């Protein structure tokens, strides 16, 4: 159920020792020709932003991290676009104008934590996953695309 896993369990009357914080990550596609990917330090922050060439003319720029209410639309806000572009422009000799933004998109990351724990800074929150078994129900909390196969293998071994 992805970001809705904890809600689904609650609405089903199943108690879990985990919950999920929802973090929106937004990205921009920009007209920018790069030969190599870049990792940029966000000035004054402990965050990084990446710039990955998509083809000879465009690059993927991201990402942001903002707590997200699942009742709200999952979109890249104007403020996030400005934030990402400003970080990129601090590292370019010639700033990229907003007219070079081709498109934007956003997604929600499910950040797992024990129900009684509090996470202050989402940038430092764990991207790990947790597996919880309740009778014949296997629930997966958190995780990342890069570890999805390994997580799937762990779940398959429980079946």
Regions flagged by a language model, labelled:
Residues 1-3:
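Short glycine-/small-residue-rich Rossmann-like dinucleotide-binding loops
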Residues 7-61, 66-159:
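C-terminal catalytic lobe of FAD-dependent flavoproteins
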């Amino acid at each position: 159920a992805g970001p809705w896993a904890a809600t689904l369990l609650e609405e089903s009357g199943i108690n879990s020792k985990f919950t999920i914080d929802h973090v929106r990550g937004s990205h921009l596609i920009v007209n920018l020709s790069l030969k190599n990917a870049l990792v940029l330090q966000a000035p004054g922050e402990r965050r990084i932003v990446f710039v990955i060439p998509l083809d000879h003319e465009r690059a993927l720029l991201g990402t942001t991290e903002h707590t997200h209410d699942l009742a709200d639309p999952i979109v890249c806000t104007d403020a996030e676009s400005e934030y990402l572009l400003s970080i990129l422009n601090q590292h370019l000799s010639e700033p990229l104008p907003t007219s070079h933004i081709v498109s934007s998109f956003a997604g929600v990351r499910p950040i797992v934590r024990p129900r009684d724990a509090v996470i202050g800074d989402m940038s430092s929150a764990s991207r790990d996953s947790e597996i919880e078994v309740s009778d014949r129900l296997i629930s997966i909390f958190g995780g990342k695309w890069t570890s999805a196969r390994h997580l799937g293998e762990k779940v398959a071994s429980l079946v």
